[in-house]
């Protein structure tokens, strides 16, 4: 069954795997998803990630996937307590540099798609660039 919102699907997979205390989660590959995962790793919300290819048996089809290692605290509390899609396919949300909202008073991050690439809210404010609010993580 086709997915209408690939980024939303990725965020849901991360949220569900984190709440179920899984060690890793496998996500279908795309350039946008890979950039978001790089930002999550840089911010310390996830561990390592590996891009690999899965071949379907008896077919010559190859599907690239991203295997993400999830992070947990000392008491097995997930590093990602909340992850939410902001800009959706049915209602896109954009913000100028001075209008980018803070998440939980600065304790969380917003991930934006800007003209200079995918970045967190603090970096976008520093570079004075706005963009599409993809998601919030806390």
From Swiss-Prot:
The keyword Ribosomal protein applies. GO terms for molecular function: rRNA binding; structural constituent of ribosome. The keyword Phosphoprotein does not apply. Keywords: Ribonucleoprotein, Ribosomal protein, RNA-binding, rRNA-binding. One of its GO terms (biological process) is translation. Pfam families: Ribosomal_S8. Transmembrane segments: none annotated. GO terms for cellular component: ribonucleoprotein complex; ribosome. Belongs to the universal ribosomal protein uS8 family. PANTHER family: 40S RIBOSOMAL PROTEIN S15A (PTHR11758). Part of the 30S ribosomal subunit. Contacts proteins S5 and S12. HAMAP family: Ribosomal_uS8_B. One of the primary rRNA binding proteins, it binds directly to 16S rRNA central domain where it helps coordinate assembly of the platform of the 30S subunit. This is Small ribosomal subunit protein uS8. It comes from Myxococcus xanthus (strain DK1622). The gene is rpsH.
């Amino acid at each position: 069954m086709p997915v209408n919102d690939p980024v939303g699907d990725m965020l849901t997979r991360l949220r569900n795997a984190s709440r179920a205390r899984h060690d890793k989660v496998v996500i279908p590959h795309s350039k946008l998803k890979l950039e978001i995962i790089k930002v999550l790793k840089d911010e310390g919300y996830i561990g390592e990630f590996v891009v690999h290819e899965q071949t379907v048996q008896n077919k010559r089809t190859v599907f690239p996937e991203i295997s993400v290692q999830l992070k947990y605290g000392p008491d097995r509390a997930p590093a990602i307590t909340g992850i939410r899609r902001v800009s959706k396919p049915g209602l896109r949300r954009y913000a100028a540099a001075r209008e980018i909202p803070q998440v939980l008073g600065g304790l969380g991050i917003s991930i934006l798609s800007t003209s200079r690439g995918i970045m967190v809210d603090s970096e976008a404010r520093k570079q004075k660039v706005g963009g599409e609010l993809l998601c919030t993580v806390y």
